[in-house]
Curated annotation (Swiss-Prot):
This is Bifunctional purine biosynthesis protein PurH. The gene is purH. Keywords: Hydrolase, Multifunctional enzyme, Purine biosynthesis, Transferase. Belongs to the PurH family. One of its GO terms (molecular function) is phosphoribosylaminoimidazolecarboxamide formyltransferase activity. SMART domains: AICARFT_IMPCHas, MGS. GO terms for biological process: 'de novo' IMP biosynthetic process. InterPro entries: AICAR_Tfase_dup_dom_sf, Cytidine_deaminase-like, MGS-like_dom, MGS-like_dom_sf, PurH-like. The keyword DNA-binding does not apply.
Amino acid sequence: MGVVAKKFPIPDLHRVRRVLLSVSDKTGVVAFAQALHAYSVELISTGGTAKVLMDAGLPVKDVAEVTGFPEIMDGRVKTLHPLIHGALLGVRQDPSHAVAMEKHGIHGIDLLVVNLYPFEKTSQSGADGQTILENIDIGGPAMIRAAAKNHAYTGVVTAVSDYDFVLAELKQHDGCLSFSMRRQLAMRAYAHTAAYDAAIATWFAQDLKIETPSWQSFSGYLENVMRYGENPHQQAAFYRNNEKRFGVATAKLLQGKALSYNNMNDTDAAFELVAEFDPQKTTAVALIKHANPCGVAEGKSLKEAYLKALMCDNVSAFGGIVALNQPLDEECAEEIVKIFTEVIIAPDATIAAREIIARKKNLRLLTTGGLPDPRCGGLVAKTLAGGILVQSRDNMVVDDLNLQVVTKRAPSQDEMRDLQFAFRVVKHVKSNAIVYAKNSATVGIGAGQMSRIDSAKIAARKAEESAQRAGLTESPTRGSVVASDAFFPFADGLLAAVEAGATALIQPGGSMRDEEVIAAADAHGLAMVFTGVRHFRH
């Protein structure tokens, strides 16, 4: 059994008479301290913070004056002292605590203002290991945890963004903090130190190249609360972490309504897909609905790529997401606004394009400043009942694979180009996934089926339907190529591709019936390439 608590009444309003300020980020601290001073609050501070406040003309007592002990070991030890921690932890209504505080000359601290050494920023800056270690804050987290534990009497502020929040409370209660406020600040404080320690543990694991540490932590700060989740009866919020990856999380919303839960999920899927296409080599557009592509294409211009992608399935594209690997231009913007679109995401957008999009006030336009690197590693997490599944990001790129021609006929140059295009796309389609492609554009996509043959049939059928809507007399799958996200367990999927008129196929290989599938390809004159890499997506 743990420590048994003694019970004392907790005051609702507690006056702030004494504050300790020790901040790494000095933003706003002078104005905050000045406001506290106006309430006759005694100011105690440390090192650099004390100097900043003194330079501003504020009466500040250095922590060394309180403890009677100087900062030592390059500032590693300055607040780790009974006169500080006793002041933070003392239970004012406990007679034994009161006696101890009086005996040792401990005067309670009613408010702690601390933000920590910038560990994450330093660890991501390319600094050497010793510099990173020096930016692990010790005294700060110790004080934060102490003050938060004793929130019955002590408020704790860990974020610059909370300064105005606290000052409004002090104004409302004439220099006092309410218990509900102190409790809320305590919750934020523990979340802050937990995230800080998680970042340190993550850095150690990465530095030691431990891919599966014994304890894995995920943390983020609240960016915004959404109206609802996937469905109106579900609550949702977005928490931001410190990953520096271009995408929806770091994008600027130039216009339109706030992004919904589904918008963010779909937009992330769209931008990750279009990032498979190197903007230095090609121009590409992806159209996404429910996190699945309904059309992807390359073109000589964004307009051409967009129209080719739209041709794949213009019905499903209605109300979807448009992702571009190049800055949105005027010509493409004029085409996009012709149908209802939820979100456009691109590295940037020209002034003329922005003016066109502004005609649709609810259309969301996001710019990211760049594309995510599809080769970059990272973790992907999925929550389960009672746990979290964690895996590395699928960062295999078709350009880096050793493609093996396994049939008698090798793909032509045009077929190989389309095969690689299709394999880029199929990586981002929910399994089981089949993609038909022709002339650097998808013409049919089959997604999320329990059997591969069904995905193949659906992809061909959707291509036929799109051709009929466009008034075409021949199915676009004639002369197309096919990509599969996983191997064909039987030859039936390949035969469905033959029936649709495909001439070449790309797949991972690895089935116990590979020879049967290869023989079927040879019998029908198909060229087939094995990649050796599977792209399941769930």
